[in-house]
Amino acid sequence: MRQTTFVKHQEVKQKWFVIDAESKILGRLAAFVASRLRGKHYPHFTPNVDMGDKIIIINAEKILLTAKKEEQKLYYNHSGYPGGLRVRTAREMRAKKPIALLERAIYGMIPHTKLGDKQRKNLYVYSGSEHPHLGQNPEKLEVK
């Protein structure tokens, strides 16, 4: 009789990868990274274990938005006070904090649970081409 095997968190070995976001489309890159952060690319994927990889994204300010999304895509924030709604376009978000576009897209694709919080901590986004994680010897990963 065969039994389904489940991976325990002690058995998980996380790898480090670096992705260059220059001239990559925002949604496609975010979906790819979210899948990698969850570990869904492994054949032994277990949904209740943090088995995803650690992902470093560089050149986040050079990400592409298709069509007219630079002016038409809106991001909403509310302070919690009456009249505290702030609406920004993607262009304004990119000017103020370039990594926020990418982080927000990826975070929206990861479950909003305690496990999702752990998986989100495995993402490191930098606006330039330099990052401080050279000691981990990250492998270069190409987005399909």
Curated annotation (Swiss-Prot):
SUPFAM superfamilies listed in its UniProt record: Ribosomal protein L13 (SSF52161)
Family statement: Belongs to the universal ribosomal protein uL13 family.
Domain of life the protein comes from: Bacteria
Hydrolase recorded as keyword: no
SS bond partners: none
Keyword Ribosomal protein applies: yes
The protein's name in its UniProt record: Large ribosomal subunit protein uL13
InterPro entries hit by this protein: Ribosomal_uL13, Ribosomal_uL13_bac-type, Ribosomal_uL13_sf
GO cellular component annotations of the record: cytosolic large ribosomal subunit
Organism field: Mesomycoplasma hyopneumoniae (strain 7448)
Keywords (A to Z) from UniProt: Ribonucleoprotein, Ribosomal protein
